Regions:
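A short, charged, Gly/Pro-tolerant segment at domain boundaries
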Residues: 296-305
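Active-site metal-binding loops of divalent metal-dependent hydrolases
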Residues: 22-23, 244-246
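Short acidic/polar active-site loop segments enriched in Thr and Asp
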Residues: 39-40, 45, 95, 122-125, ...
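Short gly/pro/ser/thr-enriched loop/turn and capping motifs at secondary-structure boundaries
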Residues: 48-53, 132-134, 196-199, 270-272
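C-terminal helical cap(s) of enzyme catalytic domains, especially alpha/beta-barrels
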Residues: 55-64, 200-214, 256, 268-293
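Alpha/beta enzyme core
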Residues: 83, 104-241, 247-260, 265
Length: 305
């Protein structure tokens, strides 16, 4: 009998599967399709201080290796999430949930996290530092170690809940950013976020996305995710949620061998709503095939020494 249980920042999960933020709504939408309590947990839509209407359409474009998306952090704002979305979720999901937080200033991150800290069902705060720093020239907070550490410190000051920093693959040195976040009080990392990309409509001779560029996701990103998880695992001692192009139970095992303690599934949910259910159901047989009894024991297994 295999054991799929893992622990993420002190919270035990039945399995390592976490639908990624922005691909699973607030959970209750998917609860109409299957029992979402089979998930390890999930990360709900990126939450900001004020409501955001997102980018104009079209927001999604396909490419051979996956999807481009430019949704633009559409969400009703943190107060509405607390008053409306979390009560709906509580009726169908009976586990701690991961709250994904976005901000455009250090103060906004702290304010949103402080409000979510008071919510009993929120188990982890996933802090998306791929957002542009509007007071710092527009570069993403996660682009350099100093600004990433500033956000981490500000959030650490307002919560005792586990903080997971979501890292951008555009950072010049993702391992240095990860170390800075750990030193500033982060409890975990999630990576990788999307990579900026673009498609052009040949008939219109214009960008396919109204926003011109969008975030690349899907299977084409998987080797990059494996490499960066492997790299960050060697740089920090806190757990990693690995993500980027995961579509199968084999992908989950591969990312865990690279160093992930849990695994996010993103674009696959948009292509196939039952993707996470299938991966969870397939996981025990894949573990048995490769002689694995306990998932916790394989974390980082691809590293030397």
């Amino acid at each position: 009998m295999v054991n799929t249980k893992v622990t993420l920042c002190g919270i035990e999960m039945d399995n390592p599967i976490i639908p990624a933020s922005g691909t699973f709504g607030y959970g209750y939408e998917f609860a109409e399709l299957y029992d979402i309590n089979m998930l390890g947990t999930f990360s709900f839509k990126g939450t900001t201080r004020e409501p955001r209407f997102g980018n104009p359409t079209p927001r999604i474009a396909e490419y051979a290796g996956g999807l481009l998306n430019a949704v633009g952090l559409q969400n009703p704002g943190v107060d509405a999430v607390i008053e409306t979305e979390l009560p709906k979720l509580k009726q169908v999901f009976h586990k701690p949930v991961m709250a994904n937080v976005s901000g455009f200033s250090v103060a906004e991150y702290a304010e949103v996290c402080e409000k979510l800290d008071a919510q009993e069902q929120v188990g982890w705060l996933e802090v998306n530092i791929s957002c542009p720093n509007v007071h710092g020239g527009g570069a993403a907070f996660g682009a350099d170690p100093k600004s990433a550490a500033e956000v981490t410190k500000a959030v650490r000051a307002v919560t005792k809940k586990p903080i997971i920093l979501k890292l951008s693959p555009t950072a010049a040195d993702i391992a240095a950013v990860a170390r800075a976040c750990e030193d500033a009080g982060a409890d975990g990392m999630s990576l990788i976020n999307t990579l900026p990309g673009m498609r052009i409509d040949l008939k219109r001779r214009r960008p396919l996305l109204a926003n011109t560029t969008g975030g690349m996701s899907g299977p084409g990103m998987f080797p990059l995710a494996v490499r960066m998880v492997y790299q960050v695992y060697e740089a920090v001692s806190i757990p990693i949620v690995g993500m980027g192009g995961v579509t199968t139970a084999e992908d989950v095992i591969e990312l865990m061998l690279a160093g992930a303690a849990a695994v996010g599934v993103g674009a696959a949910n948009l292509v196939e709503p039952y993707a996470c259910k299938t991966i969870i159901e397939d996981l025990p047989a894949v573990m048995e095939r490769y002689g694995m009894e306990n998932l916790t024991e394989i974390i980082g297994g691809a590293h030397h020494g």
